[in-house]
Amino acid sequence: MMSFSTSLILASGSSARRMLLENAGLAVQARPVDLDEEALRRSCEEQGHTLSQTAIALADAKANLATRDVGFDELTVAADQILDLDGVAFAKPGSVAEAAEHLRRLRGRTHVLRTAVVLYKGGEKVWEHLASPRLTMRDFSDDFLKAYLEREGPAILSCVGAYRLEGPGIQLFSAVEGVQDAVMGLPLLPLLEELRELKVLAA
């Protein structure tokens, strides 16, 4: 029976992704997985994968791990995001000092967020999608950067690019091309459309 809402397993501990799903009226069960993302990234690079293909592979691997021992009709969603600066991938910063270095490299330039989402039903993948929002950072001053890092602190270490667009990080930018949910790590509208196609949400 179709309804306005449905229940999803989210293969992530991301509070931003969970918030997006819950705000859309979906019931979410977070199920973070233990995935060696760096090893998978290296494997993808060795195989000559693009950053878009790597983002999809990472999301797929997370969903695959989270779907072990799930019911036949259970739905699992997983996502991944890679910051692409002229073909160079950025990982999440490991320290505030590394976050500062990332932001200096991104300052005054345009980067792309390769944002992948996959959907599993039972143990089988039924759908995947990739969004690629483009973001341009303004040429902010060193004083602004220092104040920004003091304001945000370790909170930005969980964010690729060292910014939260839904917070003070918006002040880093002069232009954003793409929907905010994709920037936040989950292309929500395409996912909702697929859930309607699967007849688990009312059309």
From Swiss-Prot:
Keyword Hydrolase: yes
Keywords: Cytoplasm, Hydrolase, Nucleotide metabolism
Cellular component terms per the entry's GO annotation: cytoplasm
Main location class: cytoplasm
EC number: 3.6.1.9
Superkingdom per UniProt: Bacteria
GO biological process: nucleotide metabolic process
Catalytic activities: a ribonucleoside 5'-triphosphate + H2O = a ribonucleoside 5'-phosphate + diphosphate + H(+); a 2'-deoxyribonucleoside 5'-triphosphate + H2O = a 2'-deoxyribonucleoside 5'-phosphate + diphosphate + H(+)
PANTHER family: BIFUNCTIONAL DTTP/UTP PYROPHOSPHATASE/METHYLTRANSFERASE PROTEIN-RELATED, BIFUNCTIONAL DTTP_UTP PYROPHOSPHATASE_METHYLTRANSFERASE PROTEIN-RELATED
Record's function text: Nucleoside triphosphate pyrophosphatase. May have a dual role in cell division arrest and in preventing the incorporation of modified nucleotides into cellular nucleic acids.
The protein, known as: Nucleoside triphosphate pyrophosphatase
